[in-house]
Amino acid sequence: MKKTAIYFFTLLLLFVSACKSEKVPNVSNAQVYTRVTFNRETTSATTRINQYFSDKYRKGAFNGVVLFAEKGNIVFEKAFGYSDFRKKTPLTTNSVFQLASVSKQFTAFAVMLLKERGKLSYSDSVRKFFPNFPYENITIRQLLTHASGLPNYMYFANDYWPDKHKLMDNRDMFSMLQNNRPEPYFRPGLRYFYSNTGYAVLASIVEKVSGMPFYKFMETQIFKPLGMENTFVYNPQNPLPMNVAEGHNPNRAPVGFNYQNGVVGDKNVYSTVEDLLRWDYALYKAQLVGQECLTEAFTPAFKNLRDDHNYGFGWRINEKDNIVYHGGWWDGYRSYIVRSLGDQRTIIVLINTAQHVPFHLPDLEELF
């Protein structure tokens, strides 16, 4: 994975059908899977990785938590810097971060789970669940693969949301779409265009189909069954846990209130590096959904995209090198996960500053 997985990790930093499986456990008897067995043996990779990130930290160019793993075993794990710069609270490997767009893979997985349960089909139209949805012929599959053409709520909300001191949520986003009908970017299915709106719509579909708030569905159907004890979807009615790292601006001041923080599905999953490793492990073991379903999620959806820029269900894909990956940034946080499916090597980096991250291919090639 030295030159392939690291390449796509660097790329992220620079640019930021039936499924078959065993029966999915119900909420009442959900199995908590055995935690990943961690192996912290000192290796030459440990020394290289530690020196690299330590140098970046000393130069003020990195503040976050890093985890490198192989087949579920930790090769390197370390926290660098502060959770809160004002209070000088140190980060730990148990610090919780906003995952930003890395959240999309969890939203996609929720849809996959409901599909396996026979509750929906990827070919279903959004209007099947929301008859008054103002755009025709948009399917769940198109939402999953960013082919819907929906306008970006992060832009049109600036025009239509009247009180920027009040939090908006998914229902408010739907109301703005319905009342104002902002122009779509293209007709559904025409091409790929990354869509935060599409994944927020998917979260609302999960709520509609399951009869549960999105945060509760994710907690009871995914996070708890997989033993992800420090992972949750943001709910403004619940205070954030004490171990949530503060998001910071480039000048290391805390990021203030953002009225769009109430929208979920495209962002707003919070997690730790070790919980993300449990997630990684669950995907390799095809827990909760079957391997056929995961294979479809990791299959490129577009024939005309460059291989390293293709997309599946919540994951960017490099089919040639058998790598899936995603990055995210939002309100003082950056997040990155790279999974080499062949040799089961995984890189997870969570950052709580919005500054440019100076990672370059020549520096990273030999780390892992």
Predicted segments, located by residue:
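Sec-dependent signal peptide recognition
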Residues: 2-10
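C-terminal motif of bacterial Sec signal peptides marking the signal peptidase cleavage site
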Residues: 15-18
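Bacterial Sec signal peptide processing site at the extreme N-terminus
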Residues: 20-31
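Short, gly/Ser/Thr-rich active-site loops of penicillin-recognizing serine hydrolases
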Residues: 21-22, 40-43, 354-368
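Short, conserved catalytic-motif segment at the N-terminal edge
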Residues: 38-97, 119-123, 181
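Short active-site loop at a secondary-structure junction
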Residues: 57-65, 86-143, 186-195, 264-267, ...
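Short, surface-exposed loop or secondary-structure junction motifs
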Residues: 137-323, 327-331
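Short, well-ordered beta-strand elements
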Residues: 336-353
